[in-house]
Amino acid sequence: MSLAAPLTAADLWADVLAVRAQSPLVHSITNFVVMNFNANVLLALGAAPVMAHAHDEVADMAGIAQALVLNIGTLEPAWVESMHKARRAARARGIPVVLDPVGAGATAYRNRALSGLLAAGAPTVIRGNGSEVLSVAGLGAPTRGVDSTLSSNDAVAAAQTLSRRIGSVVCVSGADDHVVDALGRWATLSNGHPWMTRITGVGCSATAMIGAFAAVQPDAWRATTAAMAYLGVVGEWAAEQVIAAGNGVGSLQVKLLDGLQLLDDATFRARLKMTVHG
């Protein structure tokens, strides 16, 4: 997509359909907490997940996948080495690499592991909350474990600086999701629901979804925007359904998976709240 071409709901829906039609294999080296939910999100979306982290097979697995997702949520040294091995294989094949810097800035060990991954080469996409993105950008921000202590809006400038410096698409997620790239493109997505923050793994699942969309859409900025738009609209729709039925966040997790599989074009277009700046 050229810098001048407008991005429309129809474009994003075409990418949703491409994921459903092509069922890309997404290799995720992710954390214990979210592994099952991430896999189910990818399956509901229409993608194919594989969660492999053993040293002896990660390079081979990255060799057959269409995207690689790295998530540093539950780090330990062997997994970090597996991430590097998979990353090298992905780079050799030219498939997209999506990095989720979970808890960046929280501990010295986490920061060292993240620095090593970034030093090995810029990922295609980085997605994190406001605190994580500020930490990756080297500006520092208070963090509370994996939770952000500031809004996504407060981290847009840092995301833009980081994107220009290393060339990655950067997504800051929160009440508003912002997607920026080194060309100066910037989309803001304002769907979603506060209850989504009360289910563990929704943010990590967003990162996995970005991997699936980047596997079928070569413009990483558009792919990231499509993934975040779809998750936001589905989450908003699902929360409204659950609340209307008098149920809570446990039901929301199930309804979210239903929506990822079943949401239609008309509902997506009617609900999408997207601003493309500039």
From Swiss-Prot:
Its cofactor is Mg(2+). Pfam families: HK (PF02110). It comes from the Bacteria. Pathway: Cofactor biosynthesis; thiamine diphosphate biosynthesis; 4-methyl-5-(2-phosphoethyl)-thiazole from 5-(2-hydroxyethyl)-4-methylthiazole: step 1/1. ATP binds at R127, S173. GO terms for molecular function: ATP binding; hydroxyethylthiazole kinase activity; magnesium ion binding. Substrate binds at M51, G201. Gene3D superfamilies: 3.40.1190.20. Its EC number is 2.7.1.50. It catalyses: 5-(2-hydroxyethyl)-4-methylthiazole + ATP = 4-methyl-5-(2-phosphooxyethyl)-thiazole + ADP + H(+). The keyword Magnesium applies. Belongs to the Thz kinase family. HAMAP family: Thz_kinase (MF_00228). This is Hydroxyethylthiazole kinase. It comes from Leptothrix cholodnii (strain ATCC 51168 / LMG 8142 / SP-6) (Leptothrix discophora (strain SP-6)).
